[in-house]
């Protein structure tokens, strides 16, 4: 299932946080992708708890993940707070962090 998880993660790179201009994977917003025989559960967080684009971004994550797998997809909001240290190194470099 590792290949499937990677495939879903790669698809989620198309989902952009428009306030920052980078994808949700590079920003570290996708915290977990769990798969079993018929389901995918994606746990994500936002850069800000008051993000006005929260529902839009969750819908985008759901759509892209659903396009990359035949399984039922659920997207849930994680409880942890986002921190720039969660970003991939290249994303931090792009933003000068």
Could you say what each language-model-derived stretch is?
Residues 1-97:
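Domain-level signature for proteins that mediate thiol-based redox and metal-cofactor handling
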